[in-house]
Amino acid sequence: LILPYVMPGFILSKQVYNEIKGFDINQYKGIILHHHGVFTYSNNAREAYENMIELVTRAESYISENGVVQHVESQSEVNLLDLARIRKSVSASRGSAQLAMLDQSDEAKGFASRDDIADIASRGPLTPDHVTRTKRIPVILDAKPDENVSEIQSFVNEYKAYFERNKVDGLIMLDPAPRAAVWSSNGTIAFGSTVKECNIITDIARHTRWTIQVGESLGGWKPLSEREIFDLEYWVLQQAKLANDEGKDNAHQGKIAIVTGAAGGIGCATCEVLAAEGAVVIGLDIDPDVKNVLKEVGGTGMICDVTDDNQVHKIIDEVVAIYGGLDILVCNAGTFLSGESIEEMTNKIWDNTISINLTATCRIIKNAIPYLKFGVGASIIVIGSRNYAAPGAGASAYSVSKAGVTQLARVAALELAPDGIRVNVIHPDAVFDTKLWTKKALQKSAKRYNITVDEYKNKNLLGVEVKSQKVGEMVSALSSDLFYATTGAQIPIDGGNDRVI
C-alpha cells in the first residue's frame, strides 16, 4: 500500500485509517508513506520484522542495480583559518557560540565538489522531520569564502524571507542561522552548541548526500514543497522535541577551550569547571594519564610536551580541524623543580623551569592567536603565582618565570585588544592539592619560614584553604562574558598575602 504525504501525527493516522478500513490489511506486507518511510506489521513480531527486511532488501537490490552515486574526487586542502572564520560568522548569526564540525571524508568532499551542488543540495531535506535539526537547506559555501563569509548573511536573509512567505498569525521566527553547510570541495559542516547536536546533523547529512545522488540517477531528487516543510518546522510537536536541549544557560556552551597542565591540580579542576559550563575542553599534558583524567571530568586529554613547538602547533591545528575554532586558552602548565638557593641551583633546573613556565607559555599563545582572532568571546588566562610579586628564597627560577609570564600576559593584553582577545592573569598561592606541592617541597618551604608544614598551609591572612576547584571556577568566570570588559587584569586567589598587599 502506497500513500501520499500528509503531516505526521493525527492527520497521518486518520489517512491510514481511511485507506485501510473495509478491507483485509493482511493482503499487504507493509505501507510506504511518501517522505515518511516504510511501515510493516503483523500479529507476530518476527513476521513484521521479516516483512521489513524483505521490503528493504528489494529496495536495496533495485538501487544497487539502477542507482548511481557520482564519485567526484577533491584534492583540496582545508584552510583552518577559513573554517574558524566560518564558525565565527555562524555563531554571530545564531547569537551564541557554535561548534563547526567538518566532515572531510572522501564521500563528503566528493559530494561538495559536484558541479550541480548548489542545485541538488538546496531543494530540501531527505525527510521533513529533519528540518528541526538541519533547517530546510544547508548554506552553500565557496571553497575560499570572503573575509565576511557573505554566504552566511545571505542564508540568514533568505531564511527570513522564507519565514515571511509562509508564516501565519501567531508564529515567531526561529533563529535564522544555518545548521549545516556544504563547503565547496572541502566537505560538509555541522553547526551546533554541543558535540551531540553536531553528530546528529553529520549523520543526517551523510544519509542525505547518498540519497540525493541516488535519487538524481533514478529520475530526479524531489523533496517536499517549501510550504510543506515550513509547516513541519513550525509544528508545535516538532518544536517540543528540541525544548529540552541541554546547556542553553551554560556560560561556555558551544565554546572550545584548551588547557595546559591538565593531568591534575588546577589544570584538571579548570577542565572540569569549563566542561560543566558547556565548553568542549581539550586538556594537554606530558603525563599520558591525561587521557583518563580528562575523560572522567568531561573533556578530551591529549599528550603534549608544551616545550615542543611542533607538538603544540600540531595539536592546536587538530583541535580546530575537529571542532572549528578556539575560544579559550588556559596556560597552566608549570613546574617547580627544587628549593635550592641561587648558589646551589644547577643550570638544568634554571633552564627547564624557564622553558616550561615561560617560553612554552609564549609559544602556545603565539600558535593560538591566529585562531583566537576568530574566537567567540576569545580569552587567554595565564596562571601566574604569588611569587611574581612576593618571591621566596630558594625559588629564584620559579619566581622569575612567573614574573615573566605576568609581563608576557600584560604585553599580550595590549597587543590583542584590537582583535577582541582578552588576556588576564590569575595568581594562586598555597594550592596544596597540586603536583607542585610534593611532601618534600612542603617541608622545604616550611623550613624556610621556621614553621611546621601545617602552619605553612594556613598562613594566609584569611586563614582559608585555597583549593584547585576554586581556582578553576575563577578561570571560568574570568573567561566568561561576566568579564567581557576586563583585560590585562591580575587577580590573586591566595587568601590574602601581606607581602603582596
Positions of predicted regions on the chain:
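Alpha-helical segment proximal to the catalytic Tyr-Lys
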Residues: 370, 414-415, 484
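Residue(s) in the substrate-gating loop at a strand-loop-helix junction
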Residues: 385
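Short, small/polar-rich loop/turn modules that mediate ligand/substrate recognition or access, typified
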Residues: 417, 422, 486-488
